[in-house]
């Protein structure tokens, strides 16, 4: 059995705690870019915060833990109002996805409930005209002379409205006129470099229901967006049209039995995508089979004994998030109580089922009354698919091993960050700690604060580094192998 990784707290970005968290600063989206050098964080106020990893030698000598610093922040979405439906459209960022880098510019997709935007983020040099530099001697054809000695055979004429004048004669008489000897030439210099974000494309008026997912294709040119009943295929360079690839809306809405909860493209096969439903099923679609993929290529569903069904069965079986492993071999799904790992070649049952918080089953009535039972927890895998991450209540986050029963439980809290504090900007803070992981058996349901929850998480594409969002704060944890 492999030794568990030694997870340590690395950094935190955000506010001062749940009690001080304003609604606009709550974090609903976190995403690493393809290199892992950037982290994008979206908040409920429509802003996107970008963090950049530092690679300076001095920081690496002091600590082996990775360090991220503030890079940029911009307003992605504004609150809107749909006058046709008399509905307010929140500015909250639902999802963020990084696009392939082009030249020195970063590109990313952001979406709220209705509108998707493609942003270009780049470093812009602000130039200014510096103080004029004084140069002695006349200028001819752009060259500067250090003195006023010229060849006798070289005569230069200048023309104006009064006619031609011999410039050599003027130069001989310039000893009494310093204004002709001293030329002030302005110089253009770079004053500063600022990070600028500009919207390149706006994709809108395609979704009648709230957008819950966006996923970039492996071809780097297309992506899908899904709402409760439809999935659309877009081209990044065309925002005037899209193609509907899945439509589960019935003719009569009274016959509606399920909704789409999440969708994602295959990491390597550009024609394959999957989507999950509120019935607990995962369906695989193939764009080569037909333009409209209502007839799925595969369906992943686990049989449930009818005798075990209850009033809450359908609610807790609804899948809140799905992820492909980076090689496309496995599918990770999360519902309210469990985390399931599926083999793409085996549809009838998952290869691994993990009970996240089985101790909450007796409290389902209470969770239904306070609406916690409808919370949507995200999940993710590491770069080789051997580690799985998801969140829970009381700001707990669980890291599971695919090949064993290892469960590393960490608590994302401010109490873990008292040892060292360093202010980076007015909007961010960096803290370090060595708090030991919590044992899962030490968790007591009666002591759990259900207002504290880690719903959103992301894993570095190459390293053992995770980012989780709790209220208005982002926590970073890094791990090393025990020796």
Curated annotation (Swiss-Prot):
Keywords: Cytoplasm, Cytoskeleton, Repeat, WD repeat
GO molecular function, one term: protein phosphatase regulator activity
One of the protein's GO biological processes: myosin filament assembly
Gene Ontology CC terms, in alphabetical order: centrosome; cytosol; protein phosphatase type 2A complex
Bias (Basic and acidic residues): 433-443
WD repeat start and end residues: 22-61, 88-129, 206-244, 255-295, 314-352, 369-410, 449-483
Compartments (UniProt record): Cytoplasm, Cytosol; Cytoplasm, Cytoskeleton, Microtubule organizing center, Centrosome
Pfam families: WD40
Region described as Disordered: spans on this chain: 132-152, 421-443
Entry-linked InterPro entries: PP2A_PR55, PP2A_PR55_CS, WD40/YVTN_repeat-like_dom_sf, WD40_repeat_dom_sf, WD40_rpt
Superkingdom of origin organism: Eukaryota
Function: The B regulatory subunit might modulate substrate selectivity and catalytic activity, and might also direct the localization of the catalytic enzyme to a particular subcellular compartment.
Family designation: Belongs to the phosphatase 2A regulatory subunit B family.
Quaternary structure note: PP2A consists of a trimeric holoenzyme, composed of a 37 kDa catalytic subunit (C subunit) and a 65 kDa constant regulatory subunit (A subunit), that associates with a variety of regulatory subunits (B subunit) such as phr2AB (B55) and psrA (B56 homolog). The trimer may partially dissociates into a core 'AC' dimer equally active compared to the trimer.
PANTHER family: PROTEIN PHOSPHATASE PP2A REGULATORY SUBUNIT B
Protein name from the UniProt record: Serine/threonine-protein phosphatase 2A regulatory subunit phr2AB
Organism: Dictyostelium discoideum
